[in-house]
Amino acid sequence: MRGTPYYYNGDELGMTNPGFTKITDYRDMPTLNVYKHLIATGGDIKQFMKRIQFSCRDNSRTPFQWNSSANGGFTTGTPWIGVNPNYKTINEAAEDKDPNSVLNYFRKLVQLRKENLTL
């Protein structure tokens, strides 16, 4: 039986977590609620901010990075959540040109799967 590979928006580029450092950069309500609770109870905010750089759902919600223009080419307006600061180097336009990029590796894997019924 064939498996079903899946990847989320940005995986094909190797997009990374944005590394937001301010709570105002986040939009995820459970994260914001825990932050408010920690403030109210004297929790360790510094440790919490480090942890959410890896665990918050907003890490997978940043705009897709199409190119190196403002907002990664995602919009000419203001995105609802900030663009990853690395959009100038990790973006679809740059990776499309690089035969050794993560994007082109994904393309090779997709082609391999199409050509091989066992996969």
Identify the function of each model-found stretch:
Residues 1-119:
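Loop/helix patches that line or flank the sugar-binding groove of alpha-linked glycan CAZymes
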